[in-house]
Regions:
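A structural signal for multi-pass alpha-helical bundles of membrane permease subunits
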Residues: 3-285
Length: 285
């Protein structure tokens, strides 16, 4: 049966709104890409995408060393040398903690879970001073392995992901646990042989969130990394902004674009599982 006029109009407006919102969301990224090929005068002349006098000076300057101590490649290697361990530790520890809260009944479970959730209301700035003092005593500040930035994630300190995975586990039938126990599986065998494969889209979504948040983190490296040669991309971009003599915005935008490319690639490669994981978490809360 053909589409009626009212349905056609409704469909047109629906897609029109979606396309309009999509353009509004993506326009800043498109402008940033075009601005990397402009000089300062053209960048501040307007917000259009058209490039009158294209130049690669921004990318050439972005690849130069700053003070001879670090370049963009080293900064990216520094970034992922703590981002990857942080993501792995977060996913593993949060999954184990969520498994304990979501599948077992033990004395004080609800109280402990409530206390854990209460930590979500603590601003990170409140924790910065005690954490800095503690990590200083441990000798982790300015550690070559960035221990102060990621080691705590091995102890399920990322409450948001624990809570998120608990919600996901509520969608997994408990009959599977009983069937695994009948087959002789221990609790940990049930976790990684039965639960984890079913939670893979949810784990991917948690990993993506942590990956993007860690790559964009500025305060953590600012507190715990004190040697310019160890700076990650977030501090490297700030290092390239000389407030005394002024700076070329095409270089800053080129650095920013290069820094987010790995995040975009990872997101687009895992977007199907990411959407599936987010949708699964919304089924039951």
């Amino acid at each position: 049966m053909g589409m009626t006029a009212s349905n056609a109009i409704a469909t047109f407006f629906k897609y029109f709104v979606l396309i309009l919102v999509g353009l509004i969301m993506i326009y800043p990224l498109l402008w940033m890409i075009s601005a990397t090929f402009k000089d300062n005068s053209e960048i501040f002349a307007g917000i259009g995408l058209w490039i009158k006098n294209p130049t690669l000076e921004g990318y050439r300057n972005a690849l130069n060393n700053f003070g001879g101590s670090i370049n963009i490649l080293q900064a990216m290697l520094n970034t992922y040398s703590y981002v990857l361990p942080k993501v792995i530790c977060t996913v593993v520890s949060s999954c184990i903690a969520a498994y304990g809260f979501g599948r077992f009944d033990f004395p004080g479970r609800k109280i402990l879970f409530s206390i854990m959730l209460a930590t979500l209301f603590l601003p990170q700035v409140v924790l910065n001073v005690p954490q800095f003092l503690l990590y200083t005593k441990f000798g982790w500040v300015n550690s070559p392995f960035y221990l102060a930035i990621w080691v705590h994630c091995a102890f399920a300190t990322e409450t948001y992901f624990v809570y998120q995975l608990v919600q996901f586990m509520r969608n997994v039938p408990r009959d599977l646990d009983e069937a695994a126990a009948i087959d002789g599986c221990s609790s940990f065998q049930t976790l990684y042989k039965v639960i984890v494969p079913m939670l893979m889209p949810d784990l991917v979504s948690c990993a993506l969130f942590q990956f993007m948040w860690s790559c964009n983190d500025f305060m953590g490296p600012l507190l715990y990394v004190q040697t310019p040669a160890k700076y990650p991309m977030s501090l490297f971009v700030k290092l390239s902004m000389d407030g005394d003599t002024g700076f070329a915005w095409n270089r800053i935008l080129a650095l920013s674009l290069i820094s987010i490319l790995p995040q975009l690639i990872v997101f687009f490669c895992a977007q199907d599982q990411f959407v599936e994981g987010i949708s699964a978490g919304a089924v039951k809360g």
